[in-house]
UniProtKB/Swiss-Prot annotation:
E.C. numbers: 3.4.19.12
Pfam families membership: DUSP, UCH, zf-UBP
GO molecular function terms listed in the Swiss-Prot or TrEMBL record: cysteine-type deubiquitinase activity; cysteine-type endopeptidase activity; zinc ion binding
GO biological process, one term: cell migration
This protein's name: Ubiquitin carboxyl-terminal hydrolase 33
Positions annotated as active site in the UniProt record: C157, H623
UniProt free text on domains: The UBP-type zinc finger binds 3 zinc ions. However, it does not bind ubiquitin, probably because the conserved Arg in position 55 is replaced by a Glu residue.
Gene behind this protein: usp33
Native source species: Xenopus tropicalis
Residue numbers binding Zn(2+) 1: C8, H10, C83, C86
Amino acid sequence: MSSLVCDCPHLESVGEVTKEELIKKSHGSCQDCRVRGPNLWACLENGCSYVGCGESHVDHSTLHSQDTKHCLTVNLTTLRVWCYTCSKEVFLDRKLSTQPTSAKLQDSHTQESKMSSSLTLKIPAAVVSENLDIELEEEDELKTRGLTGLKNIGNTCYMNAALQALSNCPPLTHYFLDCGGLARTDKKPALCKSYQKLMSDIWHKNRPGFVIPTNLFQGIKSVNPTFRGYSQQDAQEFLRCLMDVLHEELKEQIVEVEEDAQTGIVEENLDEDKSQSDNDFHSCDSGSSSDHAESESRKLSEELTESTMLIHEDQKDVESCKTWQKEKKFSNNLNQNHFLQDFEKNIQSTIEESECLKQETVKVQIQSKAADFTAEVNMNDLPTSQTPLLNEGATTHLSSSPPKPGAVWTGHKKVPGLCPAKKRKQKKYHSVIADIFDGTIVSSVQCLTCDRVSVTLETFQDLSLPIPGKEDLAKLHSSSHQSSLVKAGSCGEAYAPQGWIAFFLEYFKSWFWGPTVTLQDCLAAFFARDELKGDNMYSCEKCKKLRNGVKFCKVQKFPEILCIHLKRFRHELMFSTKIGTHVSFPLEGLDLQPFLAKDSPSQIVTYDLLSVICHHGTASSGHYIAYCRNNLNNLWYEFDDQSVTEVSEATVQNAEAYVLFYRKASEEAQKERRRVSCLLNIMEPSLLQFYISRQWLNKFKTFAEPGPISNNDFLCIHGGVPPRKASFIEDLVVMLPQNIWDYLYSRYGGGPAVNHLYVCYTCQTEMEKIEKRRKMELETFIRLNKAFQEEESPAVIYCISMQWFREWEGFVKSKDSDPPGPIDNTKIAAAKCGHITLRQGADSGQISEETWLFLQSIYGGGPEITLRQNVTLAESEGGHAEEKIDVETRNI
């Protein structure tokens, strides 16, 4: 940063410019491509009024400088000045410092923080009004945005319909349009970049008639071979694949630390919160049964060590951040003894118990209608002094992905300074996908023999609902069934208001014209109490036998956008069929209160329809279209590939829905945004300016329930800016005047409050140390492995788990930020005649004794598995997965 102290000789060419003029220009657009801000650049050459876009678009500002030889340009979002000729940042106030300044300028300089050797940021408070009011002020100007078709590039109607449905989900689209600087990834195929470009094209002011989503389609095909070729694909499967990839590319580690020792113990027992989005997305019917041969605790311990990498936290850092982690906790924590007493009274209180699980940040993947559950509780033996749910605790991970080895070998050496032996924790992630689409369901099963209740918290991204037939509808609508459901605390309330007259009218109508199926019917069928008997008996962990049971579930947390998938396709062994039953659905006011768990933190349970994907044709062939409500003019449009046509609400309601997107409806959220806009208009000068997360600000603009303010997406655990984010910090934050910050903080809580940005020296030092460690380990391994490759007949060969080695390789190649845990050979080891040998077909590699001792001295772990010269050939090869690790370890 030393170059910043040097004056730029080109400052003399700057014309007379005022802050008000720059702010006025920031509301404009690029003079060449008409793209709007943020991050437009204005030329400062005397007499030149050019405004152009930056690198996030076509970079017309740079082209203008090259054509005109104008040197200086100013970013209209941050008011930072760049000289193209000097290739450095310069400061206008250096040029003006010798001139007398007015009181107004002095006040302005007082309000703005100075740039020092550590990073500080200049963001004018007036820009915030543009960031907050885009939906309110620009509605008339932008009313034609979003009506762009997508060209069919080879039987891709399924993709086009899905993309149009997502495009008309304001929280997601505004993220990519307003927070484009957050869409950063080093992962291939960088689908988030392709999606961001596509959204920019679709919602451009000067939109074309249609665009061709070639880049995004190529990216999807590269990660999922299912979508290669030209056969018909499923729009719902495409949605899951796309959002899963977007999550993986955009996910950020959540900065979480222990509040105290007791909390730390509980978190060690419970493991860390992990969004379902960290794995493949699954709907609520995508679970599978588990094998009960092993104990629940063993399965859980293996799952707790799964996934990306294990994080290693410094205890001092943990203690230093206790206070602002407390601010992040929701204020709805319940007293455990209170709901243990309620739990003994009726089955419904098991949902309250699951709330305790939620507060300990336990999230698991969904398994609908499966007979495997966690957190077993005996209703007759519940003590009041503890919570068995927390002690048993656990999470269940159900995925179609192959199981990953994860158990940590604990018998390793401790090497101070290199690999502390304390228990490592899983990383916790979130992304814009998880923030918008993730919800939570509480599933409970009661054994009718011993009264033990099993409770599971399950995270879902979409609800896959069955379409009930005539007999199912009769059962759902029957008065007797209503009573049993209401008593059981299930979803019978959805039908409770229906009287006998209405019931008979509905019955006779269905007799002549067939049953009328509503979306509420599908929801009621999904959440209805399920009797587990006959071939579907419940395997009780306490009884150790198959028993009759009762299962029911409710929603603990509703997502901001609820994706509902109607199961229209049935795939049999030899053929597939499609259910063509019309399902009526509301355009506004979908009330989900009957399906909400007791004491759920969700305040808003009413949803309005955003978009619906429809399929015309049969199970083997057909065509997808989408009906979407434009958020700017509230009109409905049909998106049929590159054709976009306005339609009536009646046309939408008569559609054969396949996938529906509902958004939380909240007048209060709109009032809050208007209040903040009014505060901006009456803004008073303040001595302090506060920085707020641009990502949270997007939630405030588009979410019905934005939740507490979270500034941790641009801060490290020490309260500074992580070095890797320093170069683009202006994309992560917005500056607020004090009165706006005070209002938002008092209304939503959270934090921490930030009025000064600086690069964290501690993180910088740690980063330099970790780079030295990477270099040392990598160079040593290459040297030792090269000697091993040159050795003709080694006396002993050591085996190492390739799963662990890949994690280590990712660390030394800087693909992963944290080192792996202890060496874990448990998955490749087998006991034979009292000795540990290599398991047949194990995913293992071969290394020399020196290499093993080197890695083991740093990371510890085991067990030690060796191959000697006197073993048989078959035993030494160990299976197809064994390999000698190449010296270059995949082109280092």
